């Protein structure tokens, strides 16, 4: 994997000559997704660790977590104004919206997954398995049948910086919460640090990041309704992945961190696992989502800032 740093003055605030050198075509298949007259924009900064971006198209805003500051932030697309959405947030991390538009969140401090109702009430979806407390739910997706899938790597209890330091009561796992019975089912327990996760188009595949020592993204067959036949989709070393999203063509967009200048940002993989493109950022990227009026604007929560880029890709 060739790593080419950008000049420092790329992020100095001056206009960028198009096409933006931060958006790199590594395979001809990525050419169709780059808008030559679109540049990476820093839309907000001043955070300790930005995570879990989620788009609210009906409100024209982006929400994300500022985990160490124990708050969630809100960015208004029309005005560019940034405000505090929720504080304290229980050191919330990843978020998603369900089919009804409700916010589903992973909380480190309370070691639970919650849903915010339209009237603002908080419903606890999961906080234990077989009587033992969850570790610290990290990231979450909702499938079309309404099931809530989330990872529980335990980062939020490994120190006091993003929650409260505590002992692990359960293995690190991926869980599925049944929408009808409410049964919480462990579906993957073979990963060291299960982290970001997403479905492919038509939910035929489930991708799960292992941000442990192996630094890999795994893919599972979903034809039975449960993940089977897991295999390594891509090795992310020398860095690692975190949050991931698929576009409608089945490409996997992965946050990338820990690899240094020229690596950190977003890596884009074709369905066959080939790295076809990259978006280089000056900070470690933790998580991403698509949004905007046409769902073609990529939002990137990265270290102390949030970035965006218009693309010709359409997110799921």
Segment roles from a protein language model:
Residues 40-44, 80-86, 123-130, 182-189, ...:
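A short beta-strand motif characteristic of beta-propeller blades
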Residues 6-16, 150-169, 257-260, 311:
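Short, conserved, GDST-rich strand-edge loop motifs in beta-rich repeat architectures
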Residues 2-39:
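Blade/loop signatures of beta-propeller domains
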Residues 39, 45-60, 88-107, 112, ...:
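Beta-rich, blade/repeat-based domains predominating
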Residues 71-73, 112-114, 172-175, 216-218, ...:
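A short loop-to-beta-strand structural motif that recurs across blades of beta-propeller domains
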Residues 207, 214-274:
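Loop/turn-rich, solvent-exposed surfaces of beta-rich toroidal or solenoidal domains
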Residues 32, 57-87:
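Beta-propeller domains
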């Amino acid at each position: 994997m060739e790593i080419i740093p950008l000049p420092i003055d790329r992020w100095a605030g001056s206009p960028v000559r198009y096409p933006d050198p931060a958006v790199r075509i590594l395979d001809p298949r990525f050419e169709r997704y780059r808008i030559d007259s679109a540049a990476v924009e820093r839309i907000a900064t001043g955070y300790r660790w930005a995570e879990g971006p989620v788009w609210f198209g009906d409100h024209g805003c982006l929400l994300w977590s500022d985990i160490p500051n124990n708050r969630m932030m809100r960015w208004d697309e029309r005005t560019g104004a940034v405000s505090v959405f929720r504080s304290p947030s229980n050191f919330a991390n990843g978020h998603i919206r369900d089919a009804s538009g409700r916010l589903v969140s992973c909380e480190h401090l309370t070691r639970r997954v919650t849903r915010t109702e339209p009237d603002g009430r908080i419903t606890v979806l999961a906080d234990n398995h077989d009587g033992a407390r969850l570790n610290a739910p990290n990231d979450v997706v909702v499938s079309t049948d309404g099931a809530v899938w989330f990872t529980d790597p335990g980062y939020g209890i490994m120190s006091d910086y993003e929650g409260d330091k505590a002992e692990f009561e359960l293995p690190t796992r991926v869980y599925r919460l049944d929408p009808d019975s409410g049964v919480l089912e462990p579906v993957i327990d073979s990963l060291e640090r299960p982290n970001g996760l997403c479905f492919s188009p038509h939910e035929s595949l489930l991708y799960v990041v292992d941000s442990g020592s192996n630094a890999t993204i795994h893919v599972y067959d979903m034809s039975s309704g449960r993940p089977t036949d897991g295999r390594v989709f891509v090795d992310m070393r020398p860095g690692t992945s975190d949050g991931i999203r698929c576009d409608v063509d089945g490409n996997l967009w992965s946050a990338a961190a820990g690899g240094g200048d020229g690596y950190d940002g977003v890596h884009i993989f074709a369905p066959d696992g080939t790295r076809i493109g990259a978006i280089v950022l000056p900070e470690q990227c933790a998580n991403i989502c698509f949004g905007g009026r046409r769902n073609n604007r990529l939002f990137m929560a990265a270290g102390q800032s949030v970035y965006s880029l218009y693309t010709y890709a359409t997110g799921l």
